[in-house]
Amino acid sequence: MSRRTAESNKAILAAWNKEQELVQEGKGTREWTPKQQQDILEKGKAYDDDGVAFQGQHMKSAEMYPEYQGDPGNIQFLTRAEHLEAHNGNWRNPTNWYFNPPTKEKIDFGDGPFISCEVINLAEPVVIVPKDDSSFKEQKSEKKFNLINMKMYLIKIKK
């Protein structure tokens, strides 16, 4: 595995981890269905209606903008079809924009840095976050700690 691929994959994994945290708060970087939210919470990523995982798309492509390849803020989640559309129908085409799946609009970054996906409040959140409930915050913190430990354990097993 090349260094570029390893860095890119780490950024995508980190972006999914961040998305999981957002979903736990009733938020996300796109409008996830309740089923997709549940998948993010339980499996670490979302799946489309055909059971295919959403893909992490480097808005500023890793090939053309290697300085951004390891940054999880440069990742947006798209279905395979949306991802291909973001590349103008050819995977070899570099990207330098945010792709809006509902409108198919591309918001070009030009010579500037990427702009991270907007965090939105989900219309149908599966997690209800009580206001000012410290016990919930403690449970969430403990779950996050356990999730991090599990991921570290799995990484050690793979080595």
Identify what each model region corresponds to.
Residues 1-55, 60-158:
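Nuclease and nuclease-like effector domains acting on nucleic acids or nucleotide cofactors
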